[in-house]
Regions:
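Bacterial signal peptide processing site
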Residues: 27-34
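Short helix-loop-beta junction
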Residues: 79-93
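Short acidic/histidine-rich motifs immediately flanking catalytic phosphotransfer sites
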Residues: 109-117
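Catalytic-core regions built around general acid/base machinery
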Residues: 128-143
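Glycine-rich, charge-decorated loop segments at or immediately adjacent to ligand/cofactor-binding or catalytic sites
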Residues: 148-169
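A charged, well-structured terminal subsegment
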Residues: 176-205
Length: 209
C-alpha cells in the first residue's frame, strides 16, 4: 500500500511539474513579439502588439554580453564592455577570432542568461547572413534582445539583417560631444523594451574608457 501511495505521489508531482513547464512556455511564447524585434516591439506601426517587459527587477541582475569583432582584436567590444560596467550594469566581453566563434559566443550568451547581446556589425557579411540567422533566431526565441554595434566605415544601410532580429543599431564613438544617448540608457531602453529610436548614438570620452 505504501509503495502504491508513493507511486501516486511521484506521478502527481510529475504531472504538476509538466503543467508548470507548459504554462511557463506559453507565457514566454506570448512575451516574444510576432513581427518586431525583442527589445524594440513598441513602434507606431506595432503599438497594438506592444509587449512590455516590466519584470526586469534590479539592474544588478542584468548582464550585457558584448561579442568581439574579428577585425580589431576585440578593442571596440572591450571598450564598450568597460563603459557598460562603469555605467552600473554588469558586462561580459566574449572573445572571438573567427566568425564561427562569434556565432558560438552568441549562443553561449543566450544559454548563460545574458539579458542583452551586443554584436559588431562587421560580423555580418553576405556570405554569413544565413548562418547568423540561425543564432539570431535562437536569441529571439529565448527573448534575448540584440543590439548591432556600428563598425568603422560602415553604415546602417550596409546592414542586411531582418529588423526583427535586432532591437537597435548602436553607434558608439570616442569624442567629447554631449549630444548622445548614454551607455546606461542605450542598454536599458532595449532590455526594458522602452520606446526608442532604431539608431542610437553614444559619445564616450577617452577618460570614460
Amino acid at each position: 500500500m505504501m509503495k502504491k501511495h508513493a507511486v501516486y505521489r511521484i506521478v502527481h508531482i510529475a504531472v504538476l511539474l509538466l503543467v508548470i513547464a507548459l504554462l511557463s512556455a506559453a507565457v514566454f511564447a506570448c512575451s516574444v513579439p510576432r513581427k518586431t524585434a525583442v527589445g524594440h516591439s513598441y513602434t507606431l506601426a506595432s503599438a497594438s502588439q506592444y509587449v512590455s517587459r516590466d519584470d526586469d527587477g534590479d539592474v544588478k541582475d542584468i548582464r550585457v554580453d558584448v561579442i568581439a569583432s574579428t577585425r580589431d582584436k576585440g578593442s571596440q567590444a572591450q571598450r564598450i564592455a568597460r563603459s557598460i560596467e562603469k555605467s552600473g550594469i554588469r558586462a561580459t566581453y566574449r572573445a572571438a577570432k573567427k566568425a564561427q566563434q562569434q556565432r558560438e559566443q552568441v549562443r553561449n550568451a543566450v544559454n548563460s542568461y545574458a539579458r542583452l547581446i551586443v554584436i559588431p556589425q562587421d560580423a555580418f557579411t553576405q556570405h554569413s547572413n544565413t548562418l547568423w540567422e540561425s543564432e539570431l533566431s535562437y536569441a529571439r526565441s529565448k527573448g534575448v534582445p540584440v543590439i548591432i554595434n556600428a563598425s568603422a566605415n560602415m553604415q546602417l544601410t550596409d546592414l542586411n539583417i531582418p529588423s526583427q532580429y535586432w532591437a537597435a543599431y548602436w553607434d558608439v564613438r570616442v569624442s567629447q560631444s554631449e549630444a548622445n544617448t548614454s551607455i546606461f540608457e542605450a542598454a536599458m531602453c532595449v532590455v526594458e523594451d522602452r520606446p526608442h529610436n532604431s539608431t542610437l548614438l553614444t559619445h564616450i570620452s577617452a577618460q570614460e574608457e
